[in-house]
Amino acid sequence: MSTTFETTPAQITALMSRPTDAPVVMVNLLKFKQDGGWERYLQYGEEVAPHLERVGATIRYGGTAPANIIGDGERPWWDAILIVEYPTPAAFIDMVTSESYAAVHKHRAAALDRGDLIATSTWSIGD
C-alpha cells in the first residue's frame, strides 16, 4: 500500500514510454481523511479545474464506492473513484510538474489518507 502522493522518476519514465499520440486515462482511487478530507478534496477539485482545462483533460467519472458487488469484503478500501482522461501522457506530466499546480496539489495531499493513481489505456471490445 502506497501512502505517498508524489510520483517517482521511474513512474514518470514509464508514463513517457507510452504512445505519445494516445490518451491516458487516470483512475484515482481515493481514501479521504476522516477529519475534513472530503472538504479539502472539494477545494482541490475547484482549484485543479483550470489546470485540467489548460492541458485538455476531461473528467470522465467521479463517484463514491459504497459497496463491493464482486470481490473481497463488503466495502472497498477507497471512498471514491475519479477518472480523468488526458489527451497524451505529456499533457498529464505537463500539468503535474508545473509550479502553479504544486500550490493546488497540497490540498489533494492534505485531503487523502491514500490516493492511488493508475494510468490506463483505452481499448475497444474488438481489439
Feature annotation, model-predicted:
Residues M1-I81, P87-D94, S121-D127:
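Short S/T/G/P-rich N-terminal loop/turn motif that feeds into the first structured element of a domain
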Residues D94-S100:
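Short amphipathic alpha-helices in soluble, non-transmembrane regions
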Residues S100-K106, L112:
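A common structural junction motif
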Residues D113-L117:
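Core nucleotidyl-transferase/polymerase catalytic module
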